[in-house]
C-alpha cells in the first residue's frame, strides 16, 4: 500500500489544470458498479464529456457468465470491457490526466475503495456512491460529491477547483 500512496502523491505534486479527461473510472465490472458508473457517466456527459472508463473482467468466461446471470449486464456490449488489468504506469497516466475520479463501492463494502485512496493521494476530485465518506476527516464538499442517483450541477463540487486538504489530515 505504501508504494501505491507514493505514486499517487507524485501525481498530486504535478497537478495542473490541463486535463485530457474530465473524469476516469478504472475498476472491476461488478454488475451494480457497472450500472452506477454507466448511469453517472450518462448524467455527466453535458458537463464532463471527456470520459475515460475502463471496466475490467478477469476473463471472458466471467464476462459471459455475469452477462447471462445479472440483469445489470444484459444490455452491456462486449467492447465496453477489458480482459487485461491496466498496468501501473498507464493507471498513473490516466489519473494524472483526469480532473476527477468516479467511484462506486460494491454492495456491502465497508471502508474505502482503492479509487478513493488514489484520488486523495493524487489530489483529484471524487464522485462516489459511498455514503460513509462524509464521516471521514478528509471529506470536503468542494472535492467529494456523494452521488445518490442524480446530480445537482449547482453543487459547490462542480463550481470549484480542487481544494487542498490540511497536511495533518492527509
Regions from the language model: what does each represent?
Residues 1-109, 113, 125-139:
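Nucleotide-sugar donor-binding catalytic core of glycosyltransferases
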Residues 101, 121, 125-170:
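Pol beta-like nucleotidyltransferase catalytic core
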